[in-house]
Amino acid sequence: VDKYDDYLVVQFHTQGIEKWKKEIVEALVSVVKPKGIYERSDVMKKKREGGVIGGVGAYCHTPSQLDEERANINSPLHGKIPDKIKITENGHKFWVDVIHGQKTGFFLDQRDKRQALAKYVEGKKVLNCFSYTGGFSVYALNAGAEKVVSVDASREALEMAEENVKLNKLDEKKAEFILADVKEYLRDQTSGAYDVIILDPPAFIKDRHKINEGLSGYKKINEAALRILPPGGILVSASCSAHLSLDDFRFMLSESAGRAGRTLQILETYTHGVDHPELVAFMEGEYLKCCFALVS
């Protein structure tokens, strides 16, 4: 459950919790008293469980049928939801599209990492990769970055990132938005082009059978970023893959640094925020990890 202003967005990831949807929604309405509740659940996760959605006896496989299923579960559960919701996070303002955006519309679990970024970017050239709607970019500009370049493969996300820069009345001349594949963009940059690089990609490891494939993806983007950063540069690298442990993530960073001919010193390590408690019997809940590292 994510709360945006007076609205809630919920995701039901498993068939087990799906059975309690009615009771959960009723409890949220009673306790939180939101103006609206919107559901953004992941069809594919339930499909892997062989579950049932919207009374359909089996999952469909054609694109049109899948789109229809998504419409069945991505819908209002209570009240009305506006097209965009304006939120304030640590004094920064953002537009959130809970209907069409990724996941629930915004990545609230990264807010402490965005806050931590501020002390590293004053007067620096910052590259925000997989920038989405510009969360890290807004924080960097507000903290005095000389220039912030946001790179993402989604035109819609970049357009909202630009709106968020304007919403915070930041210097638009210091912000650049580039529609590109991050891996290709990193490959084309020269050493020293940026002082701080943020890597906040989508999950490269979707399930336990693709760990090696996903690790290869993480290594490639981190190695490419490290080749660009000069000595004294800062790498902010994150992973939201539940199947990748923090120890393995740090080892991946070490390997990437070696391949790039760099040395990394971990300055700070973060997981998800205090509102994402972890069950000791459900280690998959430890999905997010993020390291701030000094390059030499």
Could you describe each region identified by the protein language model?
Residues D2, W20-F106:
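Non-catalytic substrate-recognition/targeting regions of SAM-dependent transferases
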Residues E122-Y132:
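Conserved class I S-adenosyl-L-methionine
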Residues T133-E146:
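Conserved SAM-binding loop of SAM-dependent methyltransferases across substrates and taxa
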Residues K147-D152:
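Conserved SAM-binding motif I beta-strand of class I
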Residues E156-I198:
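S-adenosyl-L-methionine
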Residues A193, I234-S296:
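C-terminal catalytic and target-recognition region of SAM-dependent MTase-like enzymes
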Residues D195-A224:
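Mobile active-site "lid"/loop adjacent to the S-adenosyl-L-methionine
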Residues L229-P231:
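Helix-to-beta-strand junctions that scaffold the AdoMet/dcAdoMet cofactor pocket
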